[in-house]
């Protein structure tokens, strides 16, 4: 609303992501009303990926069934692909967006975070190659970037996957795994870790100030 570009981070669930998109569109609408040049406002929504597999795979391993085994390594990509489905739907259907876009507004781009592969059994390009689409930003670690340059695919890989992705989430639910419960915990843990890091930075700064003033 004030014309400031924003990175909204620590998004794990579709429910939270929808709130983020709604807030962005409302903010852009207010920015337009306040006379800001919409062409100069950018935003990304940082949606975390691999941590979801780390959490869900533990639950699947504890289940131990063949059905659970078949779902290992699939939850994170399915969740992210459904986030992209939501991205397409919201910006296509929100009645305010066409007018805002005509005034120069940019879509809030989905940014895949936590895209390094943590399970050695999976491709080291898994969370890049399987999540390629228009408007996507991917903040991959250097190791993943090097792997992608060496043997990655990089071809569009989200279009046409929504039905399969919904089916994966439904199968998890049938096994008693509520993905929202998983993502809610990941979000809470992530926020707590960010607060701890921020408090540590503030403490270091204050210590420096105290030394200068001593």
Kindly give the residue locations of the regions a language model identified:
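Flexible, acidic glycine-rich loops studded with aromatic residues
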Residues: 105-210
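Intrinsic disorder at enzyme termini
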Residues: 212-214
